[in-house]
Curated annotation (Swiss-Prot):
It is found in: Secreted. Expressed by the venom gland. It comes from Echis ocellatus. This is Snaclec CTL-Eoc124. Belongs to the snaclec family. Residues 1-23 form the signal peptide. The keyword Secreted applies.
Length: 146
């Protein structure tokens, strides 16, 4: 009986330690502060990338960022796979209504861009965004809430 209680308690501890640490993310997705992230080595336009992300997970969109640490986390996922390259992120004025927005509807509370044009990519080497032609093709960074 004592062994059963010990094993049951051990399993409970393992379960509780895994909850919220990625156990809730889909396979191949990485958890960070209540969201799951995945970088895809597939080139597509910004509009196709946003559609692709919405098809990958419930609540999925191109990644939005709210701190430099969050961008650094995405870079840590992207650089080993893509080396020096770019990934689409959710920031755009794709609809040309003169209002910069995240595709997931999140508040624009952190900015790290330069250049011009209507969509954004993030470099895979540092915390910098570039305004980019939406019709060009790039790899994809997706995010969904837990």
């Amino acid at each position: 009986m004592g062994r059963f209680i010990s094993v049951s308690f051990g399993l409970l501890v393992v379960f509780l330690s895994l909850s919220g640490t990625g156990a809730d993310c889909l396979p191949d997705w990485s958890p960070y502060q209540g969201h799951c992230y995945r970088v895809f080595n597939q080139k597509m336009t910004w509009a196709d990338a946003e559609k692709f992300c919405t098809e990958q997970a419930n609540g999925g969109h191109l990644a939005s960022f709210h701190s430099s640490k969050e961008v650094d986390f995405m870079v840590s996922l992207a650089f080993p796979m893509l080396k020096v390259d770019f990934v689409w992120i959710g920031m755009s004025d794709f609809w040309r209504d003169c209002e910069w927005k995240w595709s997931d509807g999140a508040k624009l509370d952190y900015k790290a861009w330069n250049n011009e044009l209507n969509c954004f990519v993030s470099k895979t080497t540092d915390n910098q965004w570039l305004r980019w032609d939406c019709s060009r093709t790039n790899n994809v960074a997706c995010k969904y809430p837990l």
